[in-house]
């Protein structure tokens, strides 16, 4: 297993634990479809939260948050739409997109950006 995959799994676990400590509940993890993947789908009160977890060891190519560009946001929105179509239980709930950015350059830092972008 590559260290890249290790970083991804560890980052998703850290993000999930952080969000659960802050009151969110897990609905689904690593949900995938032909349109893309949703790292975490969580519930914050009545709101369905689609969480993109981004981790970076080095900021040479930009930080974790900057890596969620317009193309990536579009894929996340399309995947979220399909998730809601296939999981009608959640379709009438309000939704938002959060990003958890983790940097391991120097001291590990986790930033949770609520409502990081609009659909």
From Swiss-Prot:
Q: Which cysteines are joined by disulfide bonds?
A: none
Under the GO molecular function aspect, what terms does this record hold?
nucleic acid binding
Residue stretches spanning the membrane? none
Pfam families, sorted: UPF0102
Which family is annotated?
Belongs to the UPF0102 family.
The protein depicted here goes by the name UPF0102 protein Pmen_0910
List the source organism. Ectopseudomonas mendocina (strain ymp)
Lineage start: Bacteria, Pseudomonadati, Pseudomonadota, Gammaproteobacteria, Pseudomonadales
């Amino acid at each position: 297993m590559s260290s890249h995959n290790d970083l991804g799994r560890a980052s998703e676990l850290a993000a999930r634990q952080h969000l659960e400590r802050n009151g969110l509940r897990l609905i689904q993890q690593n949900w995938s479809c032909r349109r893309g993947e949703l790292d975490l789908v969580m519930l914050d009160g009545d709101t369905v939260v689609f969480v993109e977890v981004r981790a970076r060891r080095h900021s040479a190519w930009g930080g974790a948050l900057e890596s969620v560009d317009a193309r990536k946001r579009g894929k996340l929105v399309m995947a979220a739409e399909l998730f809601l179509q296939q999981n009608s239980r959640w379709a009438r709930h309000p939704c938002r997109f959060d990003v958890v950015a983790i940097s391991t350059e120097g001291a590990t830092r986790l930033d949770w950006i609520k409502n990081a972008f609009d659909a």
